[in-house]
Amino acid sequence: MTAPLIYIVAGEHSGDVLGARLIHALRAINPSIRFAGIGGPRMEECGFQSLFPMHELAVMGLIEILPRVLKLRRRLQQTVQDIETRRPDLVLTIDSPGFCLRLLRAIQPFGIKRVHYVAPQVWAWREHRVKRFPGLWERMLCLLPFEEKWFAERNVPGQFVGHPVLESGADQGDAARFRARHSLADNARVIVLMPGSRANEAGRLLPVYGETLRLLMQNIPTITPVIPLASSTAHTVRGAVSSWPVQPIFITDIADKHDAFAAAEAALTKSGTSTLELAMGGVPMAVTYRVNRITAMMARRLIRVPYVAMVNLLAGREIVPELLQENCTPTKIAAVLTSLMNNAPDTNGMGAADSQKQALKAVVASLHAPNRHASDGLPSSAAAASIMEVLGQ
C-alpha cells in the first residue's frame, strides 16, 4: 500500500511553524506519510521541499497586494497544476486565506480531501464571506475558543484544537541565561521589539520604534532593545535600525527568543499572534500597527470587532494598549512603555505591568482545547489526529 501523500500549503512564517509541528505530529502517528507543497525554513528542516519560496505569498494589506497580483495569480496556477499532477491524498492549507481559499476553490473539482488549518477571521471583518465556505473543505481546524461556536451558528463546522502558542515554549525562557549569553550589564533593561514577519509591516513600524527608543533613552538610558529576526524581514530590519540611537541585539534562535522574553521588562509588538506568544511568556506589552492610509480607511469601514490585539479580543476588554495608525506615534508609545517598565500604578492601584501579567494568564488558560483529540494535549497532536480522521486512518 502506498504511503499517504499530504500536500501542505503555508504562506507565511506563522504557517511555516504550524506546518513543521504538524509534520512531526503526523509522522508520530504514521512515519511513512509523505509531504509536498509550499513551506518555509521550519518545514524544510523536516525534509520538506517547497514548490517555490514561501515568502512570495507573504503580503498583507488591500493596497500593498496590488503590485503582486499577477505574480500571485501565476503561483496559484502553478500550485493547482502541481496538485493535479501529484494527486495527493489530502490537501492541507494553513492560514493565508487570500491565497489558500482561492486554491481550495480551484481544486474542488479534483475530488481530493481538504482540511484548512486556522479559521479565516471573518468574525472580524467581511462576515459575508462565510457564505462561500461550504464545500471548500472536509474540516476546518480552529485555534481560538470562540470560533467553533461562531462558525457552527453559521452552518460551517469547525473544530477547536487549541492554540499552537501553548507548545511554543515561550514560557520556558531563562533570563539569567539570556543576560549571560549576550554579556549584558547588571543595569541593562531589556525590551523586546517585534515589528512583524512581513517586510511591508516591519518597514512601516521600525522608524517609529527607533524614534520611540530615542525618547525612552532620556529616562531609561540603559534600555536594551532585542529584535527576534525572521528570515523574511532580516534585510529590511537590519537596514532600518542602522540609524537608531542604540543598536539592538538580533536573535534568530527560538530558545534565545524565549530567554529574551524572560529577561524583558516590556515588549513592543505588531498586532496578531505575537501578542499571544508574549502573553505566554508573561511579558507586558503595547501593540502597534500601521498600514497604508487607504488600507486603514477601508479596514475601519469593514472591521467588526472592538480590538485588533488577539489578547484583547480573547479577554473581551483592552488589557494591553493598542496604538494604531495616527496613535502609533513615538511620544504615545514611549509614555505607555515607560509606565510598564516602571510598573506605575494603574487606576486600580496595581502596577501597570503586574496588572497586565495577571490578565494575560487568564487569556493563556482559555487557549486550551478540551482533551478530545490527543492524549498529550498538544494542539499539533490534536490537529494531526483530526487530519488523520479525515484521511480515514
Curated annotation (Swiss-Prot):
Keywords: Glycosyltransferase, Lipid A biosynthesis, Lipid biosynthesis, Lipid metabolism, Transferase. It is an enzyme of class 2 (transferase). Its EC number is 2.4.1.182. One of its GO terms (cellular component) is membrane. It catalyses: a lipid X + a UDP-2-N,3-O-bis[(3R)-3-hydroxyacyl]-alpha-D-glucosamine = a lipid A disaccharide + UDP + H(+). The keyword Lipid metabolism applies. Disulfide bonds: none annotated. One of its GO terms (biological process) is lipid A biosynthetic process. InterPro entries: Glyco_trans_19 (IPR003835). Pathway: Bacterial outer membrane biogenesis; LPS lipid A biosynthesis. One of its GO terms (molecular function) is phospholipid binding. Pfam families: LpxB (PF02684). The keyword Lipid biosynthesis applies. SUPFAM superfamilies: UDP-Glycosyltransferase/glycogen phosphorylase. Belongs to the LpxB family. Condensation of UDP-2,3-diacylglucosamine and 2,3-diacylglucosamine-1-phosphate to form lipid A disaccharide, a precursor of lipid A, a phosphorylated glycolipid that anchors the lipopolysaccharide to the outer membrane of the cell. This is Lipid-A-disaccharide synthase. It comes from Granulibacter bethesdensis (strain ATCC BAA-1260 / CGDNIH1). The lineage of its organism: Bacteria, Pseudomonadati, Pseudomonadota, Alphaproteobacteria, Acetobacterales. The gene is lpxB.
